[in-house]
Amino acid sequence: MVTSVAPRVESLSSSGIQSIPKEYIRPQEELTSIGNVFEEEKKDEGPQVPTIDLKDIESEDEVVRREIRERCREELKKAAMEWGVMHLVNHGISDDLINRVKVAGETFFNLPMEEKEKYANDQASGKIAGYGSKLANNASGQLEWEDYFFHLIFPEDKRDMTIWPKTPSDYVPATCEYSVKLRSLATKILSVLSLGLGLEEGRLEKEVGGMEELLLQKKINYYPKCPQPELALGVEAHTDVSALTFILHNMVPGLQLFYEGKWVTAKCVPNSIIMHIGDTIEILSNGKYKSILHRGLVNKEKVRISWAVFCEPPKEKIILKAHCQRRCLRLSHHSSHLAPFPNIFSTSSSGRPRRLYSPNEL
């Protein structure tokens, strides 16, 4: 198995190369499905990622709140069962805070390379937090067109502040504030998803660690311009092992979802947060909620940046199927976050192909 260190993709992109190294070229069977992401995003025909409006879900008016929660329950349930991904709008996190998070991340990646390298991780020794590029850890030595910055942002007592960027100065306060708001949003979503399964509101959150143990890990994905985007992927097809994944981006398209046997490009919805259902929730829901296979395309015109926050149970947490209503399948097996996830394609509960991916597998 190949475990060589990848070069910084940003350096390759800025070097003026016209052809990408062979390690970044996808297998022939994948190339036929990689199109121009800007043209793909313009398409209005065919299935579209659903949008869920959370406005007034916490209204002080009890009647309004009840009506909104019932609507959101049905819409979230439908989106989670059919897609496993959705755009959240009116989610309660201010545009100002989201902009601060984005500006801080963009500013960090605009620093000189020698400054970013001060925060470099050491994947070979198991130190995955920090600035890095994906290791070639499959048999072919294949690489993805991406650099990243990864670190745990919540709970507060588990943060390693020594690896948080000191520049820009707003990186720490913006990220800390965002983590608190996002943790609150996760509670709201898990509550509604629990109700959609016929469970009490707090059941799913309890199963993934509760307020005290659920981890929020942030990965800023930086996809430089690519001279041959038709041959490469920013991130290859995978599902997330998280419970939920929340994603911001810089309004450059690139996210694709594998839906009904085809790759669907997510549109750029202003002021939205993209949310994925992760493998953990698929397990807890006995496969009723779907962890969707997804990937990231690149382009030659614009840098794409996304901010993914993985909401994960602690590694020692045993994940069991939850009792979904009365006629749920009996608990028969479990998955533990202690067990390593293979870096290969496997089959999900719905029979579709997937490559299991964890933010700890970078």
UniProtKB/Swiss-Prot annotation:
Gene3D superfamilies: B-lactam Antibiotic, Isopenicillin N Synthase, Chain (2.60.120.330). Oxidation of leucoanthocyanidins into anthocyanidins. InterPro entries: DIOX_N, IPNS-like_FE2OG_OXY, IPNS-like_sf, Oxoglu/Fe-dep_dioxygenase_dom, Plant_2OG-oxidoreductases. It comes from the Eukaryota. Binds 1 Fe cation per subunit. Its cofactor is Fe cation; L-ascorbate. Induction: By light. One of its GO terms (biological process) is anthocyanin-containing compound biosynthetic process. The keyword Transferase does not apply. Residues 211-313 form the Fe2OG dioxygenase domain. Belongs to the iron/ascorbate-dependent oxidoreductase family. Pathway: Pigment biosynthesis; anthocyanin biosynthesis. It holds the Pfam family 2OG-FeII_Oxy. The keyword Nuclease does not apply. Fe cation binds at H238, D240, H294. Its EC number is 1.14.20.4. The lineage of its organism: Eukaryota, Viridiplantae, Streptophyta, Embryophyta, Tracheophyta. Keywords: Dioxygenase, Flavonoid biosynthesis, Iron, Metal-binding, Oxidoreductase, Vitamin C. GO terms for molecular function: L-ascorbic acid binding; leucocyanidin oxygenase activity; metal ion binding. It catalyses: a (2R,3S,4S)-leucoanthocyanidin + 2-oxoglutarate + O2 = a 4-H-anthocyanidin with a 3-hydroxy group + succinate + CO2 + 2 H2O. This is Leucoanthocyanidin dioxygenase.
